[in-house]
Amino acid sequence: MINNHMLRIGALFLLTVLSYGFYNAFLPITDPVESNYVLSAITMLKHNSWISPMIYDQVWYDKPPLTYWALMISYKLFGISDFTSRIPNTLIAGGSVALMYHLVYRIKESKHIAVMSALLLFSAL
């Protein structure tokens, strides 16, 4: 049986993922930093290079590869698009809000404070 605590965690995760997913569906990739991550992941996918980050067909050790790996997995599963470029970050945002609720609930033992903390983080993302 799922308790109310787990239902609230799931609801906060789902609220975050759906709202950010809906918002991200209409935004093109325009930020220069975001486009570097996307281009690097596409280049790495093209070369099947899961170890060395690449951009413009050159090795590029500017950032750790975890973000590139998440993007590459998203592209492998759903294809390359602006929307799928934002799936990993949307899932991380949902997990962050759910984790905020869970941790504050464990520390303060107050549902009200935990929900307010999670919603405050949600509004800042």
Annotate each language-model stretch with its function.
Residues 1-125:
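Membrane-integral, polyisoprenol-dependent glycosyltransferases
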